[in-house]
Amino acid sequence: MSESAEHLKDEGSKTQSMIAGATAGLIARFVIAPLDVVKIRLQLQSHSASDPLSQRDLRGSPIYKGTIPTIKRIFREEGLAALWKGNVPAELMYVSYSAIQFTTYRSVTLGLQDAFGEHRLPAAAESFIAGASAGAVATTATYPLDLLRTRFAAQGIERVYTSLRSSIRDIAISEGPRGFFQGLGAGVGQIVPYMGIFFATYESLRLPMGTLNMPFGSADASAGVIASVIAKTGIFPFDLIRKRLQVQGPTRERYVHKNIPVYNGVFQTMRHILHNEGYRGLYRGLTVSLFKSAPASAVTMWTYERVLGILLKWEKSQELSK
């Protein structure tokens, strides 16, 4: 945790928050990229490995079961690089998202403090509002990159898109501007409570855990892991719905899963999944998602705190040298 700072949101300038957030996002994304590909493949799988009746219309689609077997199968059939499919738009998304998220979080919190003055909101409420606002703004601003990441990760041996440039051109021509925002409603519906719960939990744990003298400055990382697990489990169905909506359109039957159903809107998608796959269908990929989110949040928050601390020390040294 950075020195002499009571709250994450009070630390550093807007530029410092943006640099630290972007750096944290870049590093975290590369570390968890293979787990992200596995999660997306499992989320898009509408058939069950344990239900033969759901496998009647596979159309050549693979049957994935579990994190490790899925990693092995992707590696065997598509090669090592396949575990980083969609990493270019994902890196761009994570860097942009993290920078916007931390900057907005700080700005909203300071705005709330100015608005309420001496009658400041409780810390948990303040963190929830700032976190939810930051999540909504960052999600909307970077959503086209999120959609591209999903579509690239969903590609099997057959390549639907050959490059980032071609994917943007093809979607713009065949689906129009709205094609880049398919599933945005589910994305915002997911991220607002997620970020609110995440930051409120993180802020409530960060200072108490900071007094435990954990090795390697791991208190920030541990708080990030716990906050991420709690938040991710609560909103996971919306994340799955978002992924299935993102691969709708003229290329729907060309991804690794050839039998992805036609979905229209968040609630119709949820009803369809519940009717055909049951409640478990809404939680496909949850385990790997938690495995992914925990290290991602730990790396993100640990890196953010370290980079911000370095920037603050550098700024202080510059002031002293004048």
Swiss-Prot record:
Pfam family, one: Mito_carr
First and last residues of every Solcar repeat: 12-111, 122-208, 215-310
InterPro entries linked to this entry: Mit_carrier, Mitochondrial_sb/sol_carrier, Mt_carrier_dom_sf
Gene Ontology CC: mitochondrial inner membrane
TM ranges: 18-38, 92-108, 128-148, 180-200, 221-241, 285-302
Gene Ontology process terms (BP): transmembrane transport
Membrane topology: Multi-pass membrane protein
Keyword Transmembrane helix: yes
UniProt entry keywords in alphabetical sequence: Membrane, Mitochondrion, Mitochondrion inner membrane, Repeat, Transmembrane, Transmembrane helix, Transport
Primary localisation category: mitochondrion
Localization annotation: Mitochondrion inner membrane
Function: Mitochondrial transporter that mediates uptake of thiamine pyrophosphate (ThPP) into mitochondria.
Family: Belongs to the mitochondrial carrier (TC 2.A.29) family.
Protein name: Mitochondrial thiamine pyrophosphate carrier 1
Species this protein is from: Botryotinia fuckeliana (strain B05.10)
Primary gene name: tpc1
